Amino acid sequence: MNIYIAAPFGNYIKPKQSNVIPVIGTYTLERRRGLLWKLLTTLRYDFKEQCWYNSLGLRNPGLAHGIDKITHGEVLSVAAIKPTDYDRLNAQIPLDIPIELNISCPNINHFKDYLKGIGQFQPRNPIL
């Protein structure tokens, strides 16, 4: 059984066990400055819901940086900002890079059909 360490923790925790896999990212097609004013509250634990929240606005240096940074045994987390991004993400990410599709970002609420286009991705091992 594999255990995945979700981003952002996967960016920093690099275990030596072969079945523990870091997920790095999340990356978007273009660089995003994110919501810097949320830096203090971006990673917080909600005791009532018993879960962690991460809402920094997908701040990242862009997909090309993520592709260059990823190493064997890691999963690349990516997110679309608009529906047409899925085709471009699929075209730019090499097939030998496993991916996680971040569809849970609370800051992506400006297009209704957020899941439209996910089926465009070619088979990979794994798609999370």
Predicted segments — roles?
Residues R33, L63-A64, K82-D87, C105-N125:
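Active-site-adjacent beta->alpha loops and helix N-cap segments on the catalytic face
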Residues D96-C105:
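Active-site groove signature of glycoside hydrolases
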Residues A7, I21, I93, I97, ...:
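Intrinsic-disorder/low-complexity coil detector
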Residues K16, I67-G73, L89-D96, I118-Q122:
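Acidic (Asp/Glu)-rich catalytic clusters
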Residues S18, L36-K38, A91, D113-K116:
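Short, glycine/charged-enriched secondary-structure capping and boundary segments
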Residues M1-E74, A79-A80:
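N-terminal capping/small domains of soluble enzymes
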Residues D46, D68, D85-D87, D96, ...:
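Acidic-enriched, low-complexity/disordered segments with a strong bias for Aspartate over Glutamate
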